[in-house]
């Protein structure tokens, strides 16, 4: 198993999907460490957005790691990558308000993601979606599976 400074090196590929935006959604993640691979997916039958599903994929993948790790997280979402690497510090400083003083969308998930990231050393890598990257294609297929399962689940009453 690859390690750095005693920490496991993990490659994560994430993706989110949504039908209707808002509508039912799904997320998927592929975690690779050494010779091991783990796939995660899930969905939301109620009204959600593609951005919420992208965030959820990253959160679930990072929360699945059982110990602090060195992570390379690959995403096709510029919203996710820019949010966590650039915008989040300002949002936190402004009390989770945008520069226009409006509430940050998905603040609940951004805060959860920030907590999940704190345990790890994470490098955020953007990949072009639907361009043949094997990890992204697999994460996309898992997100589609999560969406399909969410469509078959009745929304909460």
From Swiss-Prot:
Catalytic activity, as annotated: Endonucleolytic cleavage to 5'-phosphomonoester
According to its UniProt entry, the function of this protein is described as: Endonuclease that specifically degrades the RNA of RNA-DNA hybrids.
Q: Which cofactor does it need?
A: Mg(2+)
Region annotated Disordered sits at 136-157
Q: Does the keyword Repeat apply?
A: no
Record GO cellular component, one term: cytoplasm
Top EC class of this enzyme: hydrolase
Annotated GO molecular function terms are: magnesium ion binding; nucleic acid binding; RNA-DNA hybrid ribonuclease activity
Q: Which SUPFAM superfamilies match?
A: Ribonuclease H-like
Q: How is the cofactor bound?
A: Binds 1 Mg(2+) ion per subunit. May bind a second metal ion at a regulatory site, or after substrate binding.
Give the EC number(s) listed in the UniProt record: 3.1.26.4
Residues that hold Mg(2+) 1 according to the record: 15, 54, 76
Q: How does it assemble?
A: Monomer.
Q: Which GO terms describe its biological process?
A: DNA replication, removal of RNA primer
Pinpoint the RNase H type-1 domain residues: 6-148
Give one Pfam family.
Answer: RNase_H
* Family label: Belongs to the RNase H family.
**Protein name from the UniProt record:** Ribonuclease H
Its subcellular locations are: Cytoplasm
